[in-house]
Amino acid sequence: MNNNIRTNKTKEEFVKEMEQRINIRKTIMDFVDNVYFPMMATKFDGKVYNARFINALNAEAKKVSDRMYVKRGYSNDEIEIQLRLSQWNYNDYESILLKCKTNAEGRIDYNATINDHYTKVWIENFKSYIEEYQKSIDNYDEYMKVFAELGDALMKYNKLPHSFRGHLDKAWMRIY
């Protein structure tokens, strides 16, 4: 069988689960890059990665972990979120990133519109990944209810409503 003693899973099961987690992480980062950061930038005169914006993100990051920091990338249109965590600590990586994102959402201009194409693509991709992952989730009905609320709210209003706060964070924690 060659089971992993810590997870009690075969090598194939373990690899498949890691691939699913990576896909979900890519989907979240796509949302952060294409929807969330441009949305937050409306508070900073449209300059997405200026010093004031990065300082604001860092202030939010410090609220959830002193191991997290945000810095400018190699060019003015890049940003890096970095964590001083062990390489395989998926739970901490994702939960801290989403806590930081959720906390920072209070700064967003909720009347600004977001790119509808990215919103729909993100929701559909995320739902498809979650469907693949559902077999290992105990409380699946409650889990999908949260994502249904999130998807309906985003597509109906084409902006981030106040009810969006905390949805991702609470739902994501149920994956683990």
Task: Describe each model-derived feature in a short phrase.
Residues 24-27, 111-165:
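Ampiphathic alpha-helical segments that act as solvent-exposed interaction surfaces
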Residues 24-68:
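Negatively charged, low-complexity tracts enriched in Asp/Glu with abundant Ser/Thr
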Residues 80-135:
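Intrinsically disordered, low-complexity regulatory segments enriched in Ser/Thr/Pro
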Residues 10, 46, 50, 75-77, ...:
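Intrinsically disordered, low-complexity coil/linker segments enriched for acidic/polar
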Residues 172-176:
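Short acidic DE-rich linear segments
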Residues 50-100:
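Amphipathic, interaction-prone secondary-structure segments
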